[in-house]
Amino acid sequence: MRIAKNIIITIAIIFSLIYALNLEYFVKGVRVVYLNGYTTVYIDDYKYFDNEIINTSNPKDWILHTNYNNYKEDPSFEEFNSEMETSAFLIIENDSLLVEKYYDGYDDSSMTNSFSISKTILSLILGKAIEDGFIKSLDQKVIEFIPELKGKFAKDVRIIDLAQMSSGLKWNESTLNPFSVIAKTYFVDDLNKLILDQPFEKTPGKKFDYSSGNTQFLSIVIERATGKKIAEYFSENFWQKMNAQNDALWQLDSYESGNVKAFCCFISTAKDISRIGKLYLNNGDWNGTRLINSSFIENSIKAKVSDIYGIGTWLTNYKGLDIAMMRGHLGQYVIIIPEKKLIITRTGKKYMDNGAIEITEDSFIYIDEALRILDN
Protein backbone atom coordinates (compact mmCIF):
# COMPACT_ATOMS: atom_id res chain seq x y z
CA MET A 1 0.00 0.00 0.00
CA ARG A 2 2.83 2.38 0.91
CA ILE A 3 4.66 1.64 -2.37
CA ALA A 4 1.48 2.24 -4.38
CA LYS A 5 0.91 5.53 -2.56
CA ASN A 6 4.47 6.67 -3.32
CA ILE A 7 4.03 5.79 -7.00
CA ILE A 8 0.82 7.80 -7.17
CA ILE A 9 2.49 10.78 -5.47
CA THR A 10 5.47 10.56 -7.86
CA ILE A 11 3.19 10.47 -10.90
CA ALA A 12 1.21 13.41 -9.55
CA ILE A 13 4.42 15.41 -9.06
CA ILE A 14 5.61 14.58 -12.59
CA PHE A 15 2.34 15.70 -14.16
CA SER A 16 2.28 18.84 -12.02
CA LEU A 17 5.76 19.72 -13.26
CA ILE A 18 4.78 19.02 -16.86
CA TYR A 19 1.90 21.48 -16.68
CA ALA A 20 3.78 24.02 -14.57
CA LEU A 21 6.66 24.09 -17.06
CA ASN A 22 4.39 23.98 -20.15
CA LEU A 23 5.88 20.68 -21.28
CA GLU A 24 2.67 19.09 -22.58
CA TYR A 25 4.16 19.34 -26.08
CA PHE A 26 7.15 17.28 -24.91
CA VAL A 27 4.90 14.46 -23.71
CA LYS A 28 3.11 14.50 -27.06
CA GLY A 29 6.46 14.35 -28.84
CA VAL A 30 7.58 11.34 -26.82
CA ARG A 31 4.30 9.57 -27.54
CA VAL A 32 4.31 10.28 -31.29
CA VAL A 33 8.03 9.83 -31.98
CA TYR A 34 9.91 7.73 -29.43
CA LEU A 35 7.10 5.36 -28.49
CA ASN A 36 6.75 4.52 -32.20
CA GLY A 37 10.43 3.62 -32.47
CA TYR A 38 11.74 6.83 -34.09
CA THR A 39 14.21 9.46 -32.95
CA THR A 40 12.78 12.30 -35.03
CA VAL A 41 9.53 13.20 -36.76
CA TYR A 42 8.85 10.96 -39.76
CA ILE A 43 6.97 10.81 -43.05
CA ASP A 44 4.00 8.85 -41.67
CA ASP A 45 3.52 10.79 -38.45
CA TYR A 46 0.54 12.76 -39.77
CA LYS A 47 -1.68 9.90 -38.62
CA TYR A 48 -1.12 11.07 -35.04
CA PHE A 49 -2.12 14.70 -35.65
CA ASP A 50 -5.19 16.68 -36.61
CA ASN A 51 -5.21 17.48 -40.33
CA GLU A 52 -7.05 19.84 -42.67
CA ILE A 53 -8.27 18.32 -45.94
CA ILE A 54 -7.10 19.99 -49.17
CA ASN A 55 -9.86 19.17 -51.64
CA THR A 56 -9.12 18.36 -55.25
CA SER A 57 -11.42 18.58 -58.26
CA ASN A 58 -11.57 16.75 -61.59
CA PRO A 59 -8.57 14.51 -60.79
CA LYS A 60 -6.28 13.49 -63.63
CA ASP A 61 -3.24 11.23 -63.75
CA TRP A 62 0.08 12.21 -65.31
CA ILE A 63 0.57 11.55 -69.01
CA LEU A 64 2.93 8.60 -69.39
CA HIS A 65 6.19 9.14 -71.25
CA THR A 66 6.73 7.07 -74.40
CA ASN A 67 9.65 5.44 -72.54
CA TYR A 68 7.76 5.05 -69.26
CA ASN A 69 9.77 2.86 -66.86
CA ASN A 70 11.84 1.60 -69.78
CA TYR A 71 15.33 1.92 -68.37
CA LYS A 72 18.13 -0.21 -67.00
CA GLU A 73 18.43 -0.04 -63.24
CA ASP A 74 21.74 0.88 -61.64
CA PRO A 75 22.39 -1.64 -58.82
CA SER A 76 24.42 0.88 -56.82
CA PHE A 77 21.56 3.39 -56.99
CA GLU A 78 19.06 0.78 -55.86
CA GLU A 79 21.36 -0.13 -52.98
CA PHE A 80 21.54 3.56 -52.08
CA ASN A 81 17.73 3.80 -52.09
CA SER A 82 17.57 0.82 -49.77
CA GLU A 83 20.09 2.42 -47.42
CA MET A 84 18.21 5.75 -47.45
CA GLU A 85 14.84 3.98 -47.07
CA THR A 86 13.42 5.71 -50.12
CA SER A 87 9.65 5.41 -50.50
CA ALA A 88 9.22 6.95 -53.97
CA PHE A 89 11.45 8.05 -56.86
CA LEU A 90 9.91 9.77 -59.88
CA ILE A 91 11.30 11.41 -63.00
CA ILE A 92 9.09 13.65 -65.13
CA GLU A 93 10.35 14.90 -68.49
CA ASN A 94 8.43 17.39 -70.63
CA ASP A 95 5.41 17.03 -68.30
CA SER A 96 5.30 13.25 -68.89
CA LEU A 97 5.99 10.60 -66.26
CA LEU A 98 9.19 8.83 -67.30
CA VAL A 99 10.15 6.87 -64.18
CA GLU A 100 7.91 5.79 -61.32
CA LYS A 101 9.26 3.50 -58.64
CA TYR A 102 8.18 2.77 -55.08
CA TYR A 103 9.92 0.99 -52.24
CA ASP A 104 9.36 -0.54 -48.83
CA GLY A 105 5.63 -1.15 -49.23
CA TYR A 106 4.76 2.34 -50.49
CA ASP A 107 2.86 2.84 -53.75
CA ASP A 108 1.26 5.54 -55.90
CA SER A 109 -1.55 6.03 -53.38
CA SER A 110 0.72 6.38 -50.34
CA MET A 111 0.56 9.78 -48.68
CA THR A 112 3.64 11.04 -46.85
CA ASN A 113 4.73 14.20 -45.09
CA SER A 114 6.68 16.56 -47.35
CA PHE A 115 7.93 18.59 -44.36
CA SER A 116 9.56 21.86 -45.52
CA ILE A 117 8.40 21.52 -49.10
CA SER A 118 5.41 23.24 -47.51
CA LYS A 119 7.52 26.40 -47.43
CA THR A 120 7.54 26.42 -51.23
CA ILE A 121 3.80 25.85 -51.30
CA LEU A 122 3.26 28.77 -48.93
CA SER A 123 5.39 30.95 -51.22
CA LEU A 124 2.98 30.14 -54.05
CA ILE A 125 0.08 31.14 -51.82
CA LEU A 126 1.86 34.39 -51.00
CA GLY A 127 2.32 35.15 -54.69
CA LYS A 128 -1.36 34.55 -55.33
CA ALA A 129 -2.40 36.79 -52.43
CA ILE A 130 -0.29 39.59 -53.93
CA GLU A 131 -1.74 38.96 -57.39
CA ASP A 132 -5.28 39.04 -55.97
CA GLY A 133 -4.60 42.40 -54.33
CA PHE A 134 -4.84 41.26 -50.72
CA ILE A 135 -1.19 42.20 -50.19
CA LYS A 136 0.27 45.28 -51.90
CA SER A 137 3.75 43.92 -52.57
CA LEU A 138 6.65 41.97 -51.12
CA ASP A 139 7.89 45.24 -49.63
CA GLN A 140 4.78 45.79 -47.50
CA LYS A 141 5.50 45.87 -43.76
CA VAL A 142 4.49 42.82 -41.76
CA ILE A 143 3.30 44.98 -38.87
CA GLU A 144 0.44 46.25 -41.05
CA PHE A 145 -1.06 42.77 -40.73
CA ILE A 146 0.35 41.77 -37.35
CA PRO A 147 0.34 44.90 -35.15
CA GLU A 148 1.28 42.80 -32.11
CA LEU A 149 4.67 41.95 -33.64
CA LYS A 150 7.45 41.92 -31.03
CA GLY A 151 11.11 42.90 -30.95
CA LYS A 152 13.41 45.85 -31.55
CA PHE A 153 13.00 45.63 -35.35
CA ALA A 154 9.31 44.68 -35.49
CA LYS A 155 8.37 47.85 -37.38
CA ASP A 156 11.02 47.26 -40.04
CA VAL A 157 10.28 43.70 -41.14
CA ARG A 158 8.89 43.39 -44.67
CA ILE A 159 7.08 40.45 -46.20
CA ILE A 160 10.07 39.77 -48.45
CA ASP A 161 12.26 39.47 -45.34
CA LEU A 162 10.10 36.59 -44.13
CA ALA A 163 9.94 35.00 -47.59
CA GLN A 164 13.70 35.10 -48.23
CA MET A 165 14.64 34.09 -44.65
CA SER A 166 16.28 37.36 -43.64
CA SER A 167 13.85 38.79 -41.08
CA GLY A 168 16.16 38.90 -38.06
CA LEU A 169 13.78 36.70 -36.08
CA LYS A 170 15.14 35.20 -32.87
CA TRP A 171 14.98 31.48 -33.61
CA ASN A 172 16.71 28.13 -33.14
CA GLU A 173 16.08 25.75 -36.05
CA SER A 174 17.95 22.85 -34.45
CA THR A 175 15.82 19.71 -34.35
CA LEU A 176 18.26 17.95 -32.02
CA ASN A 177 17.14 19.84 -28.91
CA PRO A 178 13.70 18.61 -27.72
CA PHE A 179 13.24 21.86 -25.79
CA SER A 180 14.01 24.19 -28.72
CA VAL A 181 11.37 26.41 -30.27
CA ILE A 182 11.29 24.31 -33.46
CA ALA A 183 10.45 21.22 -31.39
CA LYS A 184 7.65 23.12 -29.71
CA THR A 185 6.21 24.31 -33.03
CA TYR A 186 5.67 20.73 -34.12
CA PHE A 187 3.77 19.58 -31.05
CA VAL A 188 2.05 22.54 -29.36
CA ASP A 189 -1.75 22.85 -29.55
CA ASP A 190 -1.73 26.58 -30.34
CA LEU A 191 1.11 27.19 -32.77
CA ASN A 192 0.41 30.79 -33.68
CA LYS A 193 0.28 31.82 -30.03
CA LEU A 194 3.83 30.47 -29.69
CA ILE A 195 4.98 32.10 -32.93
CA LEU A 196 3.62 35.54 -32.13
CA ASP A 197 5.69 35.56 -28.96
CA GLN A 198 8.98 35.34 -30.91
CA PRO A 199 10.79 38.69 -31.30
CA PHE A 200 12.62 40.23 -34.26
CA GLU A 201 15.99 41.12 -32.76
CA LYS A 202 18.30 41.77 -35.73
CA THR A 203 18.23 44.16 -38.66
CA PRO A 204 16.00 42.57 -41.35
CA GLY A 205 17.03 42.10 -44.96
CA LYS A 206 20.73 41.72 -44.24
CA LYS A 207 21.51 38.10 -43.45
CA PHE A 208 20.09 34.73 -44.54
CA ASP A 209 18.99 32.71 -41.52
CA TYR A 210 16.78 29.75 -42.36
CA SER A 211 13.85 29.72 -39.97
CA SER A 212 10.53 27.88 -39.88
CA GLY A 213 9.25 30.77 -37.80
CA ASN A 214 9.50 33.07 -40.83
CA THR A 215 7.14 30.84 -42.78
CA GLN A 216 4.64 30.57 -39.96
CA PHE A 217 4.59 34.36 -39.57
CA LEU A 218 4.01 34.56 -43.32
CA SER A 219 0.99 32.27 -43.04
CA ILE A 220 -0.51 34.57 -40.40
CA VAL A 221 -0.03 37.53 -42.74
CA ILE A 222 -1.74 35.69 -45.61
CA GLU A 223 -4.70 34.54 -43.55
CA ARG A 224 -5.29 38.00 -42.12
CA ALA A 225 -4.90 39.61 -45.55
CA THR A 226 -7.19 37.23 -47.44
CA GLY A 227 -9.66 36.44 -44.68
CA LYS A 228 -9.33 32.78 -45.63
CA LYS A 229 -7.60 29.79 -44.12
CA ILE A 230 -4.39 28.71 -45.86
CA ALA A 231 -5.80 25.29 -46.77
CA GLU A 232 -8.94 26.75 -48.34
CA TYR A 233 -7.08 29.40 -50.32
CA PHE A 234 -4.56 26.86 -51.64
CA SER A 235 -7.25 24.35 -52.58
CA GLU A 236 -9.29 26.91 -54.51
CA ASN A 237 -6.40 28.52 -56.36
CA PHE A 238 -4.04 25.61 -56.94
CA TRP A 239 -4.84 22.05 -55.85
CA GLN A 240 -8.20 21.85 -57.62
CA LYS A 241 -6.96 23.62 -60.73
CA MET A 242 -3.92 21.33 -60.95
CA ASN A 243 -6.29 18.33 -61.08
CA ALA A 244 -4.51 16.54 -58.25
CA GLN A 245 -5.45 12.87 -58.18
CA ASN A 246 -6.08 12.86 -54.46
CA ASP A 247 -7.18 15.16 -51.70
CA ALA A 248 -4.14 16.22 -49.70
CA LEU A 249 -3.79 16.98 -46.00
CA TRP A 250 -2.18 19.86 -44.17
CA GLN A 251 -1.24 19.14 -40.59
CA LEU A 252 -2.82 21.34 -37.90
CA ASP A 253 -1.66 22.21 -34.42
CA SER A 254 -5.13 21.13 -33.23
CA TYR A 255 -8.71 21.27 -34.46
CA GLU A 256 -9.44 23.70 -31.63
CA SER A 257 -6.83 26.26 -32.72
CA GLY A 258 -7.08 25.42 -36.42
CA ASN A 259 -3.64 26.70 -37.44
CA VAL A 260 -1.90 24.87 -40.28
CA LYS A 261 1.76 24.09 -39.75
CA ALA A 262 2.65 26.23 -42.74
CA PHE A 263 6.38 25.70 -42.21
CA CYS A 264 5.98 21.98 -42.74
CA CYS A 265 3.61 19.09 -42.98
CA PHE A 266 1.82 19.15 -46.33
CA ILE A 267 0.85 15.52 -46.89
CA SER A 268 0.23 14.05 -50.34
CA THR A 269 1.28 11.34 -52.76
CA ALA A 270 4.60 11.61 -54.57
CA LYS A 271 2.87 12.09 -57.92
CA ASP A 272 0.68 14.87 -56.59
CA ILE A 273 3.46 16.81 -54.85
CA SER A 274 5.32 16.67 -58.19
CA ARG A 275 2.61 18.94 -59.61
CA ILE A 276 4.13 21.81 -57.66
CA GLY A 277 7.33 21.17 -59.61
CA LYS A 278 5.44 21.24 -62.89
CA LEU A 279 3.88 24.58 -62.00
CA TYR A 280 7.32 26.07 -61.31
CA LEU A 281 8.84 24.47 -64.40
CA ASN A 282 6.14 26.09 -66.54
CA ASN A 283 6.38 29.49 -64.84
CA GLY A 284 2.94 29.36 -63.25
CA ASP A 285 1.09 27.94 -66.26
CA TRP A 286 -0.95 24.76 -65.88
CA ASN A 287 -1.86 23.13 -69.19
CA GLY A 288 -2.66 26.49 -70.77
CA THR A 289 -4.26 28.08 -67.71
CA ARG A 290 -2.26 30.61 -65.74
CA LEU A 291 -2.50 29.92 -62.02
CA ILE A 292 0.02 32.51 -60.88
CA ASN A 293 1.94 35.37 -62.44
CA SER A 294 5.06 34.15 -64.24
CA SER A 295 7.09 37.05 -62.86
CA PHE A 296 6.55 35.82 -59.31
CA ILE A 297 7.80 32.33 -60.20
CA GLU A 298 10.81 33.75 -62.02
CA ASN A 299 11.61 35.97 -59.03
CA SER A 300 11.23 33.02 -56.65
CA ILE A 301 14.03 31.06 -58.26
CA LYS A 302 16.52 33.92 -58.24
CA ALA A 303 19.03 34.27 -55.42
CA LYS A 304 18.22 36.92 -52.84
CA VAL A 305 20.20 37.64 -49.66
CA SER A 306 21.84 34.21 -50.01
CA ASP A 307 23.02 32.65 -53.27
CA ILE A 308 21.46 29.33 -52.22
CA TYR A 309 17.91 30.54 -51.55
CA GLY A 310 15.24 32.47 -53.43
CA ILE A 311 11.65 32.74 -52.22
CA GLY A 312 10.74 29.35 -50.78
CA THR A 313 13.17 27.54 -53.09
CA TRP A 314 16.73 26.27 -52.76
CA LEU A 315 19.11 27.09 -55.60
CA THR A 316 22.27 25.52 -56.94
CA ASN A 317 24.24 24.97 -60.12
CA TYR A 318 25.33 21.41 -60.80
CA LYS A 319 27.19 20.19 -63.87
CA GLY A 320 26.45 23.51 -65.54
CA LEU A 321 22.71 23.21 -64.89
CA ASP A 322 20.72 25.78 -62.91
CA ILE A 323 18.59 23.90 -60.42
CA ALA A 324 15.70 24.97 -58.18
CA MET A 325 14.79 22.64 -55.38
CA MET A 326 12.06 22.10 -52.82
CA ARG A 327 13.46 20.35 -49.77
CA GLY A 328 12.01 18.71 -46.70
CA HIS A 329 13.30 16.96 -43.59
CA LEU A 330 14.74 13.45 -44.15
CA GLY A 331 15.28 14.03 -47.87
CA GLN A 332 11.92 14.97 -49.35
CA TYR A 333 12.77 16.54 -52.71
CA VAL A 334 11.08 18.06 -55.72
CA ILE A 335 13.96 19.08 -57.98
CA ILE A 336 13.46 21.26 -61.06
CA ILE A 337 15.97 21.48 -63.91
CA PRO A 338 14.48 23.95 -66.43
CA GLU A 339 17.12 23.38 -69.13
CA LYS A 340 16.22 19.68 -69.24
CA LYS A 341 12.44 20.21 -68.71
CA LEU A 342 12.95 17.83 -65.83
CA ILE A 343 11.34 17.21 -62.45
CA ILE A 344 12.82 14.72 -59.98
CA THR A 345 10.79 13.75 -56.92
CA ARG A 346 12.10 11.68 -54.06
CA THR A 347 10.40 10.84 -50.76
CA GLY A 348 11.81 8.69 -47.98
CA LYS A 349 12.95 8.22 -44.41
CA LYS A 350 16.65 9.07 -44.46
CA TYR A 351 19.09 11.46 -46.07
CA MET A 352 22.79 12.29 -45.93
CA ASP A 353 22.64 14.71 -43.03
CA ASN A 354 25.85 16.71 -42.80
CA GLY A 355 24.59 18.91 -39.98
CA ALA A 356 24.51 21.98 -42.21
CA ILE A 357 21.59 23.84 -43.71
CA GLU A 358 22.99 23.71 -47.26
CA ILE A 359 21.84 21.28 -49.94
CA THR A 360 22.99 17.79 -49.02
CA GLU A 361 24.98 15.33 -51.12
CA ASP A 362 22.18 12.79 -51.54
CA SER A 363 20.12 15.20 -53.66
CA PHE A 364 22.90 15.19 -56.27
CA ILE A 365 22.83 11.39 -56.35
CA TYR A 366 19.15 11.52 -57.36
CA ILE A 367 19.98 14.15 -59.98
CA ASP A 368 22.81 12.01 -61.36
CA GLU A 369 20.51 9.02 -61.70
CA ALA A 370 17.90 11.06 -63.55
CA LEU A 371 20.51 12.45 -65.94
CA ARG A 372 21.92 8.95 -66.50
CA ILE A 373 18.49 7.62 -67.45
CA LEU A 374 17.86 10.56 -69.78
CA ASP A 375 21.18 10.02 -71.56
CA ASN A 376 20.62 6.28 -72.14
Describe each model-derived feature in a short phrase.
Residues 132-170, 197-199, 224-263, 268:
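Active-site helix/loop module of the DD-peptidase/beta-lactamase fold
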Residues 245-246, 251, 297-345, 353:
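Active-site Gly/Thr loop motif
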Residues 2-106, 135, 201, 368-376:
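N-terminal leader/targeting segments and the immediately adjacent pre-domain N-terminus
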Residues 83-86, 110, 329-330:
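Short, small/polar residue-rich loop motifs at catalytic or cofactor-binding pockets
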Residues 103-107, 111, 350-352:
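A short acidic/small-residue loop/turn micro-motif
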Residues 107, 177, 199-204, 214-216, ...:
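Flexible glycine/proline-enriched surface loops and loop-helix/loop-strand junctions
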Residues 214-221, 262-285, 332-348:
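Active-site-proximal alpha-helical segments within enzyme catalytic domains
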Residues 95, 113-138, 162, 218-222, ...:
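Active-site SXXK
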